[in-house]
């Protein structure tokens, strides 16, 4: 008997718990020849802003032991080009597309949420709060509970769609951030975004990345991500989406046990473009082999 793999995130029903992570899967179309999109639960777009962004100068990606650093700088086509050039593809796919977006003031976030709310092909919104608040001296929204709550509340007022908030791990207390976002109206929380790191070229005595620091992702961050998912899932009532170093079905299932309702696959897609599909299939096979009837029975089932 095939196990039941479907899960719910807010009002969003997913055929299985595996999504792709923002910034690692383009706008979906780029990977559609490598992945059967109808074998994964959902895909998340590159982060969108009101205006197009060229991103940071190169080099902006570097491989590290157990992962990679990126300082892409949120390069994207902007909301207008997204609507004109990227949305038509979304109509052709029977898999939920989640739009990730960011701004530099609460008003910018709200405007983007409102515009994305009006697009039927966008199934849900994911808010990237790992951006500086230009109105408050550059403090990163995702490192201050009050700032984060103000962004989430502004977005909540602008959309009826499922609102997911992606949390930064670069904080003292992730539970405090999670509870602030839940209180402001988040329907779900993505845990975690990248950790801040850097790489140095010894011979040149210079940073490898032109931006100096970047976001660390991949297997190196998995233990931190698991711990944070476990902490957050026990402290909030909304679903948690686990992210961080998921390279296999086993990795994904560990996040489910820790309390995640769904997972996102990111860096693995750079290694193997079909990673998300293979992980989803591997999870189903693991349950079937053990006679587990429903994935939901594993959510938060960690013992001890």
Swiss-Prot record:
GO cellular component term of the entry, any: cytoplasm
Family: Belongs to the dihydroorotate dehydrogenase family. Type 1 subfamily.
Sorted UniProt keywords: Cytoplasm, Flavoprotein, FMN, NAD, Oxidoreductase, Pyrimidine biosynthesis
Gene Ontology biological-process entries: 'de novo' pyrimidine nucleobase biosynthetic process; 'de novo' UMP biosynthetic process
Reaction(s) this enzyme catalyzes, per UniProt: (S)-dihydroorotate + NAD(+) = orotate + NADH + H(+)
Domain of life: Bacteria
Recorded GO MF terms: dihydroorotate dehydrogenase (NAD+) activity
Enzyme class: oxidoreductase
Residues holding substrate: 46, 70-74, 128, 193-194
Name under which the protein is recorded: Dihydroorotate dehydrogenase B (NAD(+)), catalytic subunit
The protein's Enzyme Commission number: 1.3.1.14
Source lineage: Bacteria, Pseudomonadati, Thermodesulfobacteriota, Desulfuromonadia, Geobacterales
Biological role: Catalyzes the conversion of dihydroorotate to orotate with NAD(+) as electron acceptor.
Cofactor: binding details: Binds 1 FMN per subunit.
Pathway(s) it belongs to: Pyrimidine metabolism; UMP biosynthesis via de novo pathway; orotate from (S)-dihydroorotate (NAD(+) route): step 1/1
Subcellular locations according to the entry: Cytoplasm
Binding site for FMN: 22, 46-47, 100, 128, 166, 192, 218, 244-245, 266-267
